């Protein structure tokens, strides 16, 4: 039985651990629970089909990620994980400019040709749109995508790790440094113990370079600070409201029990130690959210989460074996799409590590692209 160590238990590491453990491999996950982990802060929107990004390699990952959720949730439920944080509630992409919605609708139909999981595509009037999300401002028409979903990153990650543990995986809280000799990574050293492994997989997000640097590897991962606000409405049944995708770079989505989430900021100049909830960040999120959904004004602001989204060069994720080092794999750079791509990419990474055929050609995502 082969043994694998995963360093970093965000959505990507948790998914990789689960899919490796399902094969009977011996899996150890090590994570120091760093404040600011992207998955822990994230509220995910699974609706990549309307994206205007032109990078086809990025889109193939996002499309595969959205498609994979149905199978993944079924697998997790069979493993006794009922609180996955995932719910297919649909999404409304809203706008006041009908011509913009025309183009969006056209894009959705084109994308549905090879992504039937998009579901129904429906053009909604302003009144129909507001009926689905009652706190919206008047005047927003929309394109409704029935196959879109929301994800609570914290809950999904917990489910994946719990299911992995049921399959024999061990999850350890602590620091991990790589053990390296004669060009081969042989395991890791934690605060208290050494662990040997056939391969080590680094899925440490914004902190990956810190782990790889002692090997003489400069891993080019940058990060963006995000502040995400949570609200509570006491008089609304929000559990089935769709995700709202406004014309701006923000989003609004709802969860059960009156919880509304709005965000997020995109801060490029913050350091990894800057976990502050700032006045400017709050102002940005609130002003953009209230412009779109003035009905949010009476909601209680209950929490602001801070996370650091990791990006690799060209804003394209990397996944695979680290060049010129035996026994070392890395995956990173999912940015703001972590909850769309992460579970699928973890499944693909597990196949790659095991020497099995992956669903996608992973060559465009070679980690060599992130090495200086």
Curated annotation (Swiss-Prot):
It is an enzyme of class 1 (oxidoreductase). GO terms for cellular component: cytoplasm. Signal peptide: none annotated. Pfam families: DAO. Its cofactor is FAD. GO terms for molecular function: oxidoreductase activity. The keyword Oxidoreductase applies. SUPFAM superfamilies: FAD-linked reductases, C-terminal domain, FAD/NAD(P)-binding domain. FAD binds at residues 4-18. The keyword Flavoprotein applies. Its EC number is 1.-.-.-. Keywords: FAD, Flavoprotein, Oxidoreductase. InterPro entries: FAD-dep_OxRdtase (IPR006076), FAD/NAD-bd_sf (IPR036188). Belongs to the DadA oxidoreductase family. PANTHER family: D-AMINO ACID DEHYDROGENASE, SARCOSINE DEHYDROGENASE-RELATED. This is Uncharacterized oxidoreductase YurR. It comes from Bacillus subtilis (strain 168). The gene is yurR.
